[in-house]
């Protein structure tokens, strides 16, 4: 058994040969497991009307998983994903109406999205939701799992207004540390502290403090524990923002890490109720040799060790390289981040009009540092006692000169044409005594990648399709129960970290190099390492590259496959499939006792797409036994075995199959196809009959319809009509006789004529649309009467010469128009639509 340090020596040698990039650039997972193959090993939860399982909070001591979704909260048992409780917390209808009136979508935004859910104390949870763009917070009783609806708190600064905006938060000793956007428009980014014994404190609204950030994660590190300098605990925030220090490109986005001290009280005069310990630095994740820089930080996971000194951060990044999407995972050590925050500052030079390293003397006490033993010895027991020169300096210099670089100086792995969304990590002890870090990475198309860190490179164990074309929105891992939870838009899933049953053979189990799995010699099964710890009965070697003898040295029998009998006609092109054990294996064929070359023109050809050996124009000399081995890292695993017999006859093309292997499926497909054809035939006949009936009805209706020419009765000669004051409102009601554009409606019927003299009085004005007093009605400007059967009469202005009686002129013009109008095919032709 090779020692663990041998991995590092081998990696260094490979890197010197220039092939190290193959161990982290676009790695291929060894196994691909589709969603159909996960049916028996994955538990799922979904509920009608419930969406966006965004917030997952695990409490190991109680064995419960708390889930925040859209307008709902759930409690599940960690072991079996059994529902323990559910709460409906919807935004009121009036809040949703206000949200839509402000221009937000009532389909995707105007709901109560749960964005913060964490334990407040031993008996209550603290929960915050967007509440239709009016954030609210309240408490949940953990014992009864009920929501306190009597005391909703304002969620401003604790939860984002917009569910699509980045947010992160922590509850530490009853104090809420939150990074979010502090207003409806999302223009006030803030990192603040609420609740608890201290008063509220937040960042300055300055572009060089926070500039359009997208917050993705936060972490509490108890650095006061065991500190020889009396240091304070710290809270770290991770985000992307538009960089201010690059004058060449103002739109440059970079990844950041910022930190504040838990005991920060703000300044006495300068920076009152503002952070005095806020510092930030750039997170670098790049492949300089390929000129690829990952600046879009998407998620961060904090992996804690036995001591806070061993804290590790894993970041998920995205980038665009030409026309290709790239994703990467970078690893950062807490010690590296601390060194950057203790280094030089960056400042904006007014004279040079650019950002540069600050080279002048730094004030004392050091700006941005936490209160420690040195401060106390010099009379500074609180940030309220810090001098103004220190506070003014940190107000103008929150950005550090040095950058936080990843371990190894490059990404752990890079994947092309993939968007990573989330990552979680676990430390697993191997049977060789080493501890391995296993990463679980969610993707934008619903896959979960499982990878193990082997010193300077990564081994991709497998890829699992946990969701069908839905992004992995959230991930959380239970180290005590060894299960993983993943949330998407429509469902929540639980899967075991140690799914070892898929490996049926010793070689396959060992080659998986999965720290959770080992081969049990006694039971001849691949089992989880937690089920048995006796090294003499379990076979596992994660770091060893040469596993060819691992199974043989324990006397494990090789797997033998039963040959399939194939009889073909001479001259036939024969296709012999070979199902490989993994994506990293390649096929090795033998004929008789001889190895077959990868390609022999005119005789043998291996088709990588079909993963099959093609025997072209088989002859009698091709009769005999064929064996296919799945070869991986020098180890051969029997995959397929065929016994071929070539007989004389006409030439056809055959593919090797087991006898009657899929005959039942063929008959089932034939019956199903016949049923579909019958249903389609009946549907066509039914539609044809309906169409014929409709045509007959239309013909009968047209025969019964008579078209009568419409004639307007002639008006008797009478004096001009002068409406009286009593009937003026009725006859000139603007609602009944005017269109919205001022046109007059002409409705069939006879108005009551009353004697009177003089021109008619003008109608009352329409609000917002004053009309001139009409003295003439013009039909020429009306809409096309042939289009809809209506005649629109415009009200004229002043009389264009001459006086006369308008009603006879109206009757003549209207009669001409009606005679020209085409009759409409109406069911009741006596009823005019003029």
Swiss-Prot record:
Domain Sema: 30-497
Keyword Cell division on entry: no
Major location (coarse): membrane
Phenotypic consequence of gene deletion: Partial neonate lethality, due to defects in brain and neural tube development. In about one third of the embryos cranial neural folds fail to converge, leading to an open neural tube and exencephaly. Mice without exencephaly are viable and fertile.
Motif stretch (PDZ-binding): 831-834
Disulfide bonds: 99-110, 128-137, 261-370, 285-330, 500-517, 509-526, 578-628
Induction text: Up-regulated in differentiating myoblasts and upon muscle regeneration (at protein level).
Ig-like C2-type domain segment(s): 557-645
Subcellular location: Postsynaptic density membrane; Cytoplasmic vesicle, Secretory vesicle, Synaptic vesicle membrane
Subunit description: Interacts (via the PDZ-binding motif) with GIPC (via the PDZ domain). Interacts with NCDN. Interacts (via the PDZ-binding motif) with DLG4. Interacts with PLXNB2.
Name of the protein in its database record: Semaphorin-4C
UniProt source species: Mus musculus (Mouse)
């Amino acid at each position: 058994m090779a020692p663990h340090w041998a991995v590092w020596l081998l990696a260094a040698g490979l890197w010197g040969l220039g092939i190290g990039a193959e161990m982290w650039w676009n790695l291929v997972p060894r196994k691909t497991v589709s969603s159909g193959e996960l049916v028996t090993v994955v538990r799922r939860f979904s509920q009608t009307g419930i969406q966006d399982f965004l917030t997952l909070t695990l409490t190991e001591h109680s064995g419960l998983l708390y889930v925040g979704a859209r307008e709902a909260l759930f409690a599940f048992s960690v072991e079996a994903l059994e529902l323990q409780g559910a709460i409906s917390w919807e935004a009121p209808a009036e809040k949703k109406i206000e949200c839509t009136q402000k221009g937000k979508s009532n389909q995707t935004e105007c709901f109560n999205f749960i964005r913060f859910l964490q334990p407040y104390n031993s008996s209550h949870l603290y929960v915050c939701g967007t509440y239709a763009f009016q954030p609210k917070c309240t408490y949940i009783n953990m014992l009864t799992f009920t929501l306190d609806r009597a005391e909703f708190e304002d969620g401003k600064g604790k939860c984002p207004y917009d569910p699509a905006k980045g947010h992160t938060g922590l509850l530490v000793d009853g104090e809420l540390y939150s990074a979010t956007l502090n207003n409806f428009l999302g223009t006030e980014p803030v990192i603040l502290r609420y609740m608890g014994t201290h008063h509220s404190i937040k960042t300055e609204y300055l572009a060089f403090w926070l500039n359009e950030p997208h917050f993705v994660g936060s972490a509490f590190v108890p650095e006061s524990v065991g500190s020889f300098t009396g240091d304070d605990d710290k809270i770290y925030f991770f985000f992307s923002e538009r960089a201010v220090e690059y004058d060449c490109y103002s739109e440059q986005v970079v990844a950041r890490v910022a930190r504040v001290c838990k005991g920060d009280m703000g300044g006495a005069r300068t920076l009152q109720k503002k952070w005095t310990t806020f510092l930030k630095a750039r997170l670098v994740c790049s492949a300089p040799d390929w000129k690829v820089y990952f600046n879009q930080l998407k998620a961060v996971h904090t992996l804690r060790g036995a001591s806070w000194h061993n804290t590790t951060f894993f970041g998920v990044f995205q980038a665009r390289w030409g026309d290709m999407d790239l994703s990467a995972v970078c690893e950062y050590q807490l010690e590296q981040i601390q060194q950057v925050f203790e280094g030089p500052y960056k400042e904006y030079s007014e004279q040079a009009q650019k950002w540069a390293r600050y080279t002048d003397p730094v004030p004392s006490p050091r700006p941005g540092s936490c209160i420690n033993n040195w401060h106390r010895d010099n009379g500074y027991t609180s940030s309220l006692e810090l001098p103004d020169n220190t506070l003014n300096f940190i107000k103008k210099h929150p950005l550090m000169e040095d950058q936080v670089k990843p371990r190894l100086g490059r990404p752990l792995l890079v994947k092309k044409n993939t968007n990573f969304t989330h990552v979680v990590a676990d430390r697993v002890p191997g049977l060789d005594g080493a501890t391995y870090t296993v990463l679980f990475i969610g993707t934008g198309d619903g896959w979960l990648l499982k990878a193990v860190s082997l010193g300077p490179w990564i081994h991709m164990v497998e890829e699992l399709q946990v969701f069908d074309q839905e992004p992995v929105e959230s991930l959380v891992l239970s180290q005590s129960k060894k299960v993983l939870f993943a949330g998407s838009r429509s469902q929540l899933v639980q899967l075991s970290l140690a799914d070892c049953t898929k490996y049926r053979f010793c070689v396959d189990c060992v080659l998986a190099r999965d720290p959770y799995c080992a081969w049990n010699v006694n039971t001849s099964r691949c089992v989880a390492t937690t089920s048995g710890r006796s090294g003499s009965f379990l076979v596992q070697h994660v770091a060893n590259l040469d596993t060819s003898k691992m199974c043989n040295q324990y006397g494990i029998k090789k797997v033998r496959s039963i040959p399939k009998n194939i009889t073909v006609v001479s001259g036939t092109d024969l296709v012999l499939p070979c199902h490989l054990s993994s994506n990293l294996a390649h096929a090795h064929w033998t004929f008789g006792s001889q190895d077959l070359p990868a390609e022999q023109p005119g005789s043998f050809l291996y088709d990588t797409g079909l993963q099959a050996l093609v025997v072209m124009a088989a002859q009698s000399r091709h009769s005999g036994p064929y064996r296919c081995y799945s070869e991986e890292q020098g180890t051969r695993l029997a995959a397929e075995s065929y016994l071929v017999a070539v007989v004389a006859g006409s030439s056809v093309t055959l593919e090797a199959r087991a006898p009657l292997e899929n005959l039942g499926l063929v008959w089932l497909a034939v019956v199903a196809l016949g049923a579909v054809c019958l249903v389609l035939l009946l549907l066509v006949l039914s539609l044809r009959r309906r169409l014929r009936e409709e045509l007959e009805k239309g013909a009968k209706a047209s025969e019964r319809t008579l078209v009568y020419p419409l004639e307007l009765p002639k008006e008797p000669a009478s004096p001009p009509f002068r409406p009286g004051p009593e009937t003026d409102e009725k006859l000139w009601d603007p609602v009944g006789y005017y269109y919205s554009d001022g046109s007059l409606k002409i409705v069939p019927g006879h108005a009551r004529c009353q004697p009177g003299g003089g021109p008619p009085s003008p109608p009352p004005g329409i609000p917002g649309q004053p009309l001139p007093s009409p003295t003439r009605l013009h039909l020429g400007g009306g809409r096309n009467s042939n289009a809809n059967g209506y005649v629109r009469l415009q009200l004229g202005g002043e009389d264009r010469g001459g006086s006369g009686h308008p009603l006879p002129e109206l009757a003549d013009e209207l009669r001409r128009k009606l005679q020209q109008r085409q009759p409409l095919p109406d069911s009741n032709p006596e009823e005019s639509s003029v």
